[in-house]
């Protein structure tokens, strides 16, 4: 007979846990026979005593199996089922371009995304800025869109990895969110439940990253790669920079407009392009759609230049209820804030440092993000034309623009942005891409 308290005691005392007991514990989490207190005690025991790679794989697979696991084989897709996941940041709109680009190169991307929480923006919130786009379609519509278009970006249903949802909610209020072992299981259980053949992980490093230090980011990347592969899914990771907003804008409608400009060739900001191409190329190689990174980049550039990637995005939006002419007339459909004001630089100088987290929190304060999961958001607000590290700015020139509901909110955001920028005599942009982990 399985006793949760004995299972917890073993981890408390630093003893190994076997796969069958891990599965029994997670089944108890799902059916309610394991109490909230027991989940909290287990999470704290893991926080202090950690999990081995084998234990992390066992927890991940048990959480995957707590609900539905999508199986794409019956659809006979004719290409690999692959996806990218980011640890989150500010101005991280990569998913909206990567999904259609990879689909245009022969991949199938069933991307199950989250909403933003804290200072990081969520892909689902960005898509909610598109009128009519259904972020929670039924499974048939999701599968049909993936089959016909090659990409569908939707939200996590209650039937995918439900144990993870309960464990995460308890970790969130018991000071155990930071456990790398449990972050790994949380991310990968959902990706494995999506039925993926391969995954590329974008792990952010810097002032706007989820992990507090570069060392912790590297530790998470290594854990995800080892556990993903251990669970039977080809997994690699790239450590990318989040010391400043990735796109020159942050905020939901603004980022959708940025993605459309990127796909249609109107504007491809250098850092955003570097990260998008690196992750997309990694996915094509992972899925066997390209010989190497150079071949993959060639195919991806062709998908952009020919308009094939933009067409996939337009078809995905239309298939999931959005306007068919979004790419032709984004301004007609995307909400625009009532007040748009510049953020004047207090002094002349070169941008030395940006408090990226402060930029994300400024968007939240404007109403563009959440402090609680149930908060509603204003998709029109945010920041645009943000100055980059290494850029020279004269006193009075804009560090960026604030898009706000009213003058008072705009004034608060202007102050926050000015405090978030450090200008000096010299400044050098950090690398965009740090390291590949396989």
From Swiss-Prot:
Keyword terms, alphabetized: Glycosyltransferase, Transferase
Pathway: Pyrimidine metabolism; dTMP biosynthesis via salvage pathway; dTMP from thymine: step 1/2
The protein's Enzyme Commission number: 2.4.2.4
Keyword Transferase attached: yes
InterPro entries: Glycosyl_Trfase_fam3, Glycosyl_Trfase_fam3_N_dom, Glycosyl_Trfase_fam3_N_dom_sf, Nuc_phospho_transferase, PYNP-like_C_sf, PYNP_C, Pyrmidine_PPas_bac/euk, Pyrmidine_PPase_CS
GO terms of biological process kind: pyrimidine nucleobase metabolic process; thymidine metabolic process
GO cellular component, one term: cytosol
PROSITE patterns with a match to the protein in the record: THYMID_PHOSPHORYLASE (PS00647)
Record keyword Glycosyltransferase present: yes
GO MF entries: 1,4-alpha-oligoglucan phosphorylase activity; thymidine phosphorylase activity
Enzyme class, spelled out: transferase
Reactions that this protein is recorded to catalyse: thymidine + phosphate = 2-deoxy-alpha-D-ribose 1-phosphate + thymine
HAMAP family (UniProt xref): Thymid_phosp
Assembly: Homodimer.
Similarity comment text for this entry: Belongs to the thymidine/pyrimidine-nucleoside phosphorylase family.
Its job: The enzymes which catalyze the reversible phosphorolysis of pyrimidine nucleosides are involved in the degradation of these compounds and in their utilization as carbon and energy sources, or in the rescue of pyrimidine bases for nucleotide synthesis.
Protein name (database record): Thymidine phosphorylase
Organism: Burkholderia cenocepacia (strain HI2424)
The encoding gene: deoA
